[in-house]
UniProtKB/Swiss-Prot annotation:
Its EC number is 1.5.1.54. Pathway: One-carbon metabolism; tetrahydrofolate interconversion; Amino-acid biosynthesis; L-methionine biosynthesis via de novo pathway. The gene is metF. InterPro entries: FAD-linked_oxidoreductase-like, Mehydrof_redctse-like, MTHF_reductase_bac. Signal peptide: none annotated. This is 5,10-methylenetetrahydrofolate reductase. It catalyses: (6S)-5-methyl-5,6,7,8-tetrahydrofolate + NAD(+) = (6R)-5,10-methylene-5,6,7,8-tetrahydrofolate + NADH + H(+). (6S)-5-methyl-5,6,7,8-tetrahydrofolate binds at D118, Q181, Q217, R277. Its cofactor is FAD. GO terms for molecular function: FAD binding; methylenetetrahydrofolate reductase (NAD(P)H) activity; methylenetetrahydrofolate reductase (NADH) activity. It comes from Haemophilus influenzae (strain ATCC 51907 / DSM 11121 / KW20 / Rd). Keywords: Amino-acid biosynthesis, FAD, Flavoprotein, Methionine biosynthesis, NAD, Oxidoreductase. It is an enzyme of class 1 (oxidoreductase). The lineage of its organism: Bacteria, Pseudomonadati, Pseudomonadota, Gammaproteobacteria, Pasteurellales.
Length: 292
């Protein structure tokens, strides 16, 4: 009898998730024709979910910048979605950055994700931080600016407190939104959110959600992003190296559970790192009630 009651409670618990959430999606510029087809298939598949915006990542060199610019403009023109380019302060002068920002504004782009960017080896120029970039963008036009946060601390930060102060500096410079690095330890995120509030950051801390379809790739990414991979996640993917179908099912389950838990903790907005693949993200959103 008690078992039946537990099952009934579990079923009700699953059915009770009817909170409306907002989603946004990240894509990256394709490097060949096949990847470009995949990108546009993904964009068109996910646009029907009416995301708040979609972002497009960015490399420091001019070729990458041009690709990002072209894709963002095309998304805006062809789909009507709010498209946000990533912009970094690496390998461009302040005047060049101002011109890039003006070009975006003139193209109808109103949202930008402002980042410092990764400094290449031997980089000797004076640092141009994300807070500097936010301030520069504010001087050009009234952009809607998102910045990055690191619940498990940026790998180059001297301390967790120094990293938090740096985030506050970006907010004080004029950033409107905060998007986190992907993570899997929800307690860490919640503690980080509390610490943000304690120093006066009242902007919503939007969690970055990465559905993990390639665990080995995740391990490589985690090694240089300072993201901790919990033991339960290692166990979940154990033995699945040659089983992509099951990996996708695990990825969907983990992502859905994370969103449900975070939603009950008051989180309303979620940013999905799609890796230019729509099927899994679409399925996750569908199960969370985000539908056309």
């Amino acid at each position: 009898m008690s078992y039946a009651k537990e099952i009934d409670t579990l079923n009700q618990h699953i059915a009770d998730f009817n909170k409306k959430i907002n989603v946004s999606f990240e894509f990256f510029p394709p490097k060949n024709e096949k990847m470009e087809t995949l990108l546009w298939d993904s964009i068109h598949r996910l646009k029907v979910l009416k995301p708040k915006f979609v972002s497009v990542t960015y490399g420091a060199n001019s070729g990458e910048r041009d690709r990002t610019h072209g894709i963002v403009k095309a998304i805006k023109q062809e789909t009507g979605l709010e498209a946000a380019p990533h912009l970094t302060g690496i390998d461009a002068t302040p005047e060049e950055l101002k011109q890039i920002a003006r070009d975006y504004w003139d193209s109808g782009i109103r949202r930008i994700v402002a980042l410092r960017g990764d400094e290449p080896k031997g980089y000797a120029k004076k640092p141009f931080y994300a807070s500097d970039l936010v301030e520069l963008l504010r001087s050009v036009a009234d952009f809607d600016i998102s910045v990055a946060a690191y619940p498990e601390v940026h790998p180059e930060a001297k301390s967790a407190q120094a990293d938090l102060i740096n985030l506050k500096r970006k907010i004080d410079a004029g950033a409107n939104h905060v998007i986190t690095q992907f993570f899997f330890d929800i307690e860490n995120y919640l503690r980080f959110r509390d610490r943000c509030a304690s120093i006066g950051i009242d902007t919503e801390i939007v969690p970055g959600i990465l559905p993990v379809t390639n665990f080995k790739q995740l391990q490589k990414m985690a090694s240089f992003t300072n993201v901790k991979i919990p033991a339960w996640l290692v166990k979940a993917y154990d033995g699945l190296d040659n089983d992509p179908t099951t990996r996708n099912l695990v990825a969907a389950s983990v992502a859905m559970d994370m969103v449900k838990i975070l939603s009950r903790e008051g989180v309303n907005d979620f940013h999905f790192y799609t890796l230019n693949r729509s099927e899994l993200t679409y399925a996750i959103c569908h199960m969370l009630g985000v539908r056309p």
